[in-house]
Amino acid sequence: MNEFRTARTYNQNHVPRPYTPGRRRLSIYVAWSYPAEAGRNPAELDNRFSTMTEVRRVTWPAYEDPKWSDPLRFQQGIAGGLELFFWGWLPFQQFVQETTGHPVPVYQRVDQAGFHTPLDERVLADTDTMFVWGLDHMITGQDATSAEIEAVRDFLTREGTCLALGPHHDVGASDDLAVREIEYRHHGDALVPRQQRFGRYTRSLIAGLGVPVENRYGLRPAVTEGKKSAPLSIARDLDTKRWLEGVSSFNFHMHLPHYAVTTDDPNVIHVLGRQPIDLSRPHPFTEAGNTEFNMFLWMPPSGDRAGDVIMADTTIFSSLFGVDESLRAFWNNIVSAK
């Protein structure tokens, strides 16, 4: 028996989902150009994804099953590394569909076939919770247009909407190679180059919408019980919408962004979850006296904006980095938000 109840398809347009009271419609927008990412020269050291061959070598023997290692079944270049993301998101998509009855479409800014899909009303019209995942390397030049920013702003005027922004890490922003090496030694992932800067699209969207947050660094969480992330420091008094109810920790990932708040007004955005950092590995951020980084943030509705804005990294929604009851509780909170 196959794990999927229906056969997979490719190369067709999305069928709009009807509004169903009490059952949210979630959509995912991956803000990369797949051809730009997959077409990066593997001879370049920085600002590219790993090839599948590199993944297999570093994580050996995790991907030595022919399902992953046979070049007749799975791409071995950078494209293969990209496809792992889609595999990792499937359990979250299935969880949402089982909970809401609605499928979760995954849009790409530019997909494998070269089709360009802007974040416009076609994507937003049948969506209640919109995930925008900033996995685009800055070097590929993805920027939100003024029309896209206006479309998202209009989306957020609708009652009950939620925009979930997830710019990924920004490793090696310094021009000082010694600092880049310190950052690399801190996270310890051989698959991440000394410079890997993500999220140009989400940064431009964030700026256009006036969200006072910037993704910085790639920080390694403190751990307990092997590779389980240390519990979050949660501001439950500020979490009036119960985003983190029943949540103690997120899944472990070696390099996560610090969502730096760029306003002094404490009422604009709430830092609900902070992640303790592995202090055994030096990093400029910890050397400045920081012991935690901002992991989950919430902007409550304000003014003409009737919808919520949350900040959460893409890894929280990927099974590649593990799924436990705490993470499922978080997923359920996102799906059932009122």
Label for each model-derived stretch:
Residues 1-338:
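Short, surface-exposed patches at the edges or C-terminal ends of soluble domains, predominantly
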